[in-house]
């Protein structure tokens, strides 16, 4: 019997030795390659962070990657660092960024996100897919969001912008002061726009599916941490194994809600035969075309597959456009309140566009607002949607002109967008809000490695024009009716602190402020 225990003990000891050797190798991975790198933390601090659930928070902070960028900038095309004990590369060179995002994109089209289309249909969206699966879906969806299609969605989005104005009016009338917490209102506006224009949730449909339920399920899908940080890392690191275990990203309750909602609305439209002017109708048209193009043995199987795919298409707008668009709107209004002279310029531009179009805010008028576009670009520079872009290599990649720098297969890459947007060598006075830095001729080649407002290259945001229309309509209507100012001079640290703005209806004359009348 003791021999059995001895053998088991030796096996356990051997396994521990192998784990220690592997961990030691991982800790020294970049040192062995002679690549400049940030040393990994010691084991006990990592364990403490895991226990206190602070590891993921640190990894998401802009300061985390900005510090590495500043420390190693100029040392080579990229530097190394570690997530737990996993080696990762932080890209430093603009030319290498262009190669990754555009020139050699075929080798870097993986965002490193976990998806499981069989067990978790909503995870199989454009945001998470890779390789040929991503390419096929992108080719199907690109035509649905081309410029001329936006004119079909204009009325739908305009109605939501008008509703935003009514919400602001009612909010101000229901309270004794003129201060509002703007990001809450912006989140509601963006969510309602997506519910109506992407999910087909109009006033009639909201009797069955109230917007409050839609908001609750959206928050559940986006912010519910179904798995802990380590398990999420495992899903990213070993996706095939996790698919065998049928692991999911989307809470089952949220998945059932969105699929049921879309199935109900799509069936109603297909039965009535009345097309609508919204994005859901464009997705239904894509689905109908696929149904004709592909032949399955069972039409029922094809229908279920395409319905789940349609739900994933719609759901990606929530994942990539809800919080991001609402936050950008909040930051734009904050910066304009902080810089009233710029707010006046945007308002005057909107006023002239309205005059040119017979007193109406038209689609053409919205597209002509060049200075507003500069303000949005500068806001996205100072307050980027995400502090970094994540990519993973599909095959080994030798960095041109740098023989010792190899991006090995399955290596995670970080492009530090926040750090690059605040690099004084690229943007002089990076902490100052200067929309006029975007007024000259645009160098698209230069911007490919220095500005990431909506992403770069083939995997840039598919809904750029949709988001731009949402942003511009809201700003045009709000600035046409209100003057925004800060009710505090305290600097904004982040949106979690809240943005409280004071709103003054244009044309209202306060005692001692007669010059504010318009």
UniProtKB/Swiss-Prot annotation:
Swiss-Prot/TrEMBL cofactor(s): heme
Positions that bind heme: 461
CDD domains linked to this entry: CYP6-like
GO molecular function: heme binding; iron ion binding; monooxygenase activity; oxidoreductase activity, acting on paired donors, with incorporation or reduction of molecular oxygen
Protein name listed in UniProt: Probable cytochrome P450 317a1
InterPro entries on file: Cyt_P450 (IPR001128), Cyt_P450_CS (IPR017972), Cyt_P450_E_grp-I (IPR002401), Cyt_P450_sf (IPR036396), Insect_CytP450_Detox (IPR050476)
Keyword vocabulary terms for this entry: Endoplasmic reticulum, Heme, Iron, Membrane, Metal-binding, Microsome, Monooxygenase, Oxidoreductase
GO CC aspect terms: endoplasmic reticulum membrane
Record-linked Pfam families: p450
Membrane topology designation: Peripheral membrane protein
Reported function: May be involved in the metabolism of insect hormones and in the breakdown of synthetic insecticides.
SUPFAM superfamilies: Cytochrome P450
Cellular location(s): Endoplasmic reticulum membrane; Microsome membrane
Family of this protein: Belongs to the cytochrome P450 family.
EC code(s) of this entry: 1.14.-.-
């Amino acid at each position: 019997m003791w021999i059995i225990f001895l053998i088991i003990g030796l096996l356990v000891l051997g396994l521990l030795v192998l784990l220690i050797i592997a961990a030691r190798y991982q800790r020294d991975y970049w040192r062995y390659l002679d690549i400049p790198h940030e040393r990994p933390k010691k084991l006990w601090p990592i364990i403490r962070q895991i226990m206190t659930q602070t590891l993921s928070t640190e990894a998401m902070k802009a300061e985390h990657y900005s510090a590495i960028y500043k420390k190693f900038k100029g040392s080579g095309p990229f530097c190394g660092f570690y997530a737990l004990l996993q080696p990762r590369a932080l890209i430093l060179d603009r030319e290498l960024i262009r190669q990754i995002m555009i020139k050699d994109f075929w080798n870097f089209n993986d965002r490193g996100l976990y998806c499981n289309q069989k067990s978790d249909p909503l995870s199989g969206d454009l945001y998470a897919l890779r390789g040929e699966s991503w390419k096929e879906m992108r080719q199907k969806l690109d035509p649905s969001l081309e410029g001329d299609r936006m004119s079909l969605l204009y009325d739908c989005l305009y109605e939501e912008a008008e509703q935003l104005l009514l919400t602001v009016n009612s909010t101000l009338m229901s309270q004794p002061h003129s201060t509002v917490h703007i990001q809450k209102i912006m989140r509601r506006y963006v969510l309602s726009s997506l519910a109506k224009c992407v999910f087909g949730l109009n006033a009639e449909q909201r009797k069955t599916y109230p917007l409050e339920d839609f908001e609750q399920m959206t928050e559940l899908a986006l912010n519910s941490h179904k798995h802990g940080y380590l398990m999420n890392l495992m899903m990213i690191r070993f996706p095939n194994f996790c698919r065998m275990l049928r692991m999911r990203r989307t809470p089952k309750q949220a998945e059932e809600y969105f699929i049921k909602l879309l199935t109900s609305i799509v069936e109603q439209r297909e039965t009535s035969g009345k097309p609508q002017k919204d994005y859901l109708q464009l997705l239904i048209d894509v689905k109908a075309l696929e149904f004709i193009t592909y032949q399955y043995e069972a039409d029922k199987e094809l229908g279920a597959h395409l319905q789940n795919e349609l739900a994933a298409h719609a759901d990606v707008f929530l994942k990539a456009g809800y919080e991001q668009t609402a936050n950008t709107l909040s930051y734009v209004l904050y910066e304009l309140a902080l810089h009233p002279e710029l707010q006046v310029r945007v308002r005057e531009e909107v006023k002239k566009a309205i005059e040119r179009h017979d007193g109406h805010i038209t689609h053409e008028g919205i597209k002509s607002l060049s200075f507003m576009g500069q303000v949005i670009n500068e806001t996205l520079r100072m307050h980027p949607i995400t502090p970094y872009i994540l990519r993973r290599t599909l095959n080994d990649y030798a960095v041109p002109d740098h023989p010792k720098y190899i991006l090995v297969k399955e290596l995670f890459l970080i492009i530090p967008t926040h750090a690059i947007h605040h690099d004084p060598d690229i943007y002089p006075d990076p902490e100052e809000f200067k929309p006029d830095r975007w007024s000259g001729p645009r160098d698209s080649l230069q911007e490919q490695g220095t500005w990431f407002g909506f992403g770069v290259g083939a995997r840039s945001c598919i809904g750029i024009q949709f988001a731009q229309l949402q942003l511009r309509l809201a700003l045009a209507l709000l600035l046409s009716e209100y003057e925004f100012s800060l009710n505090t001079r305290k600097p904004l640290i982040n949106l979690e602190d809240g943005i409280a703005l004071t709103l003054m209806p244009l044309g209202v004359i306060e005692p001692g402020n007669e010059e504010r009348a318009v």
